[in-house]
Design a protein with these regions (language model features):
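A domain-start/cap signature at the N-terminus of enzymes
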Residues: 12-70, 82-83, 94, 123-126, ...
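Glycine-rich, phosphate-binding/catalytic loops in enzymes
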Residues: 87-91, 118, 174-176
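Cap/lid segment of the alpha/beta-hydrolase catalytic domain
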Residues: 105-132
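Conserved acidic catalytic loop of the alpha/beta-hydrolase fold
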Residues: 135-153
Length: 187
């Protein structure tokens, strides 16, 4: 019986070693293409004061391909991502750019502390961990868009008003710099 147990354990060890030594394959992520026209998706986002999802509004011209530019626009303090996306449709068609407008809601990111200031400090003045700050949400938004679109064209990050303050601080205070152009207005 001891011989059978030894053989069984040897076989299990051999299989485990073989599996461990095999080349690792990247986990394939499901790419959910963004349809032409207006659309929306929501992602799980751990920053902010609750577990609410963070919604992204899109406008994709019919002739847009992954080789064309992506324009990610952060709204002002009015928190109107969907309206920004609608307002940028003409620009999208003229420049053949995919428009992405995240909506950082007041409920999830209350006040300037969580939006313009990026959630860097808590109410007691303590510095939050980098992954807890709103700026890390911007990095994940860019990553989500790149994954969904397989974008190879320029990635433009734009902020208007409060969004301009947010993007400006993101660029200065540790954003991943995984974009090609950063532009801010009226901040």
């Amino acid at each position: 019986m001891g011989n059978k147990v030894f053989k069984a354990l040897t076989a299990v060890a051999a299989v485990a070693a073989a599996v461990w030594l095999l080349p690792k394959r990247k986990k394939e992520m499901a790419v959910r293409p963004i349809p032409a026209g207006e659309s929306m998706s929501c992602i799980r986002e751990r920053t902010g004061v609750n577990q609410d999802a963070l919604c992204l509004y899109y406008y994709r011209p019919g002739r847009w391909t992954e080789k064309d530019a992506v324009f990610i626009a952060f709204h002002g303090f009015g928190r109107a991502g969907a309206e920004y996306c609608k307002a940028l449709r003409k620009l999208a068609e003229e420049r053949n750019m995919l428009i992405v407008c995240p909506e950082l809601t007041e409920r999830k990111y209350p006040g300037a502390e969580w939006y313009q200031e990026g959630g860097i400090m808590d109410t007691d003045g303590h510095i939050r961990e980098k992954e807890e700050r709103t700026f890390s949400a911007a990095d994940r938004i860019v990553a989500e868009v790149k994954n969904r679109t397989q974008a190879a064209g320029k990635i433009i990050l734009f902020g208007h008003s409060a969004g301009g303050q947010f993007v400006h601080r993101w660029a200065l205070l540790g954003g991943k710099k995984n974009v090609d152009v950063i532009a801010v207005a009226n901040s």
